[in-house]
Amino acid sequence: MSIGVIVFPGSNCDRDVQWATDGCLGMSTRRVWHEETDLSGFDAIILPGGFSYGDYLRCGAIARFAPALQSLIDFAAKGGRVLGICNGFQVLTELGLLPGALTRNQNLHFICEDAPLKVVSQRTAWMQGYNDRALTLPIAHGEGRYQCSDDTLKQLQDDDAIALSYGNNPNGSVFNIAGITNASGSVLGLMPHPERACDPAIGGTDGRRMLEALLG
């Protein structure tokens, strides 16, 4: 099992992700500079949190043009597992691998707190380990409000592609959405940070089972 973590100028959670996947879970993990184009040696790709390219224009808008992401489109089309966390989720929507968009929080403030979450669908491997369907993960974002059209929301519901919802909806996301998958379930994007909840020494392990899904 080999994991690639794509690093953009402005990424700040890539080392956290590598520590979680490699240090905690023993998965061989390499950080991949955004100019690299060969992703063929990886079993899964993670887009980490941060502020890619300073979030200029809007979050993820510039990162979508990175050479590595053009290769990521092909990787995902072949069924490769892709996980986008926080800014990574924003990038996946800009890239078109996931529908909708992430916009400014409803209260216009940066939110940093532990968020109670509910597993909405256990259809995909990402969520199958959460038998109790309730978990808590850290969030830290200023543009995490998930927005989509009514037609897109219906499609997400029809595809059973809403993976996670907020218990208290801190940012005003439509339908309390915290994370979604593509129709096949191979691509997951979420605003909460599972990599920050893998070790009891730093406050919980609710993110661990989600990352273990990278093992297939």
Swiss-Prot record:
Enumerate the catalysed reactions.
N(2)-formyl-N(1)-(5-phospho-beta-D-ribosyl)glycinamide + L-glutamine + ATP + H2O = 2-formamido-N(1)-(5-O-phospho-beta-D-ribosyl)acetamidine + L-glutamate + ADP + phosphate + H(+); L-glutamine + H2O = L-glutamate + NH4(+)
Where is the protein situated, by its record's location annotation?
A: Cytoplasm
Q: Which CDD domains match?
A: GATase1_FGAR_AT
Q: List the disulfide bonds.
A: none
Q: Which InterPro entries match?
A: Class_I_gatase-like (IPR029062), PRibForGlyAmidine_synth_PurQ (IPR010075)
Q: Does the keyword DNA-binding apply?
A: no
Q: Which PROSITE patterns match?
A: GATASE_TYPE_1
Q: Does the keyword Cytoplasm apply?
A: yes
| Gene Ontology process terms (BP) | 'de novo' IMP biosynthetic process
Enzyme Commission no: 6.3.5.3, 3.5.1.2
Q: Which GO cellular component does the record give, naming just one?
A: cytoplasm
Pathway field: Purine metabolism; IMP biosynthesis via de novo pathway; 5-amino-1-(5-phospho-D-ribosyl)imidazole from N(2)-formyl-N(1)-(5-phospho-D-ribosyl)glycinamide: step 1/2
**How would you summarize the oligomeric state and partners of this protein?**
Part of the FGAM synthase complex composed of 1 PurL, 1 PurQ and 2 PurS subunits.
What job does the chain carry out?
Part of the phosphoribosylformylglycinamidine synthase complex involved in the purines biosynthetic pathway. Catalyzes the ATP-dependent conversion of formylglycinamide ribonucleotide (FGAR) and glutamine to yield formylglycinamidine ribonucleotide (FGAM) and glutamate. The FGAM synthase complex is composed of three subunits. PurQ produces an ammonia molecule by converting glutamine to glutamate. PurL transfers the ammonia molecule to FGAR to form FGAM in an ATP-dependent manner.
Matching entries from HAMAP family are given as: PurQ
Protein name per the record: Phosphoribosylformylglycinamidine synthase subunit PurQ
* Organism per entry: Synechococcus sp. (strain CC9605)
